[in-house]
Curated annotation (Swiss-Prot):
Function: Catalyzes the transfer of endogenously produced octanoic acid from octanoyl-acyl-carrier-protein onto the lipoyl domains of lipoate-dependent enzymes. Lipoyl-ACP can also act as a substrate although octanoyl-ACP is likely to be the physiological substrate.
Keyword vocabulary terms for this entry: Acyltransferase, Cytoplasm, Transferase
Reactions the enzyme catalyzes: octanoyl-[ACP] + L-lysyl-[protein] = N(6)-octanoyl-L-lysyl-[protein] + holo-[ACP] + H(+)
Gene3D superfamilies listed in its UniProt record: Bira Bifunctional Protein, Domain 2
Binding locations of substrate: R68, G69, G70, Q71, V72, T73, Y74, H75, A157, L158, G159, G170, L171, A172
Name the record gives this protein: Octanoyltransferase
Gene Ontology annotations of biological process type: protein modification process
Organism (species): Methylibium petroleiphilum (strain ATCC BAA-1232 / LMG 22953 / PM1)
Compartments reported by the entry: Cytoplasm
Remaining remarks: In the reaction, the free carboxyl group of octanoic acid is attached via an amide linkage to the epsilon-amino group of a specific lysine residue of lipoyl domains of lipoate-dependent enzymes.
Broad class of where this protein is predominantly found: cytoplasm
Amino acid sequence: MAMQRRRLGRVDYATTFDAMRAFTETRTPGTPDELWLCEHPPVFTQGLAGKAEHVLDAGDIPVVASNRGGQVTYHGPGQVVAYPLIDLQALGIFVKEYVFRLEQAVIKTLEGYGVTGHRVTGAPGIYVNLCDPFGHGALPGPPDPRDPWRGIGKIAALGIKVSRHCSYHGLALNVAMDLSPYERINPCGYAGLRTVDLSTIGVPVDPERAAADLGDRLESYLSP
């Protein structure tokens, strides 16, 4: 069965969370996989590992508890959020391989814009070398224990939930957004981690195009 792609536009986070959870709870072996692409109004979301101390000053931005993995992150306009609703058992892969494919889809999307995306062991998501986001060298290292994130910027966040072999939640790619809300949190629980978007590193991409490109990559990596 072909994956169904849905472009939701700008939608409330909590409403979307409830909808994808309901979809996952009621789907059957015959339900086609879906890929939801959207953006959210400003919101902080806390994953299952989230700690209150990592929300430094939420201010007027709501904080919503979520059942995805990970800690606190931010969603807002100018960010492409992708929610793949996938039957992993039918696809024939386990969670570790699923996460690898999600990250690979982001890496290949960035590659299309000339940007080199990197994985960081133990820190899900995709990162760029702030000194040379277009080069093919490794990230700066070894890390300085006083500033372990020096020279590294996070450009995509990832957090998933798997229930009855089926995934929901997903990933967020920063395209052209107001990044100042990230200063109100320790992104993903990491103090000092800088968050960037494509615009910050000199890649002027329209979020609609980025959503289409990311959607294409996700479909290619998550289809049988």
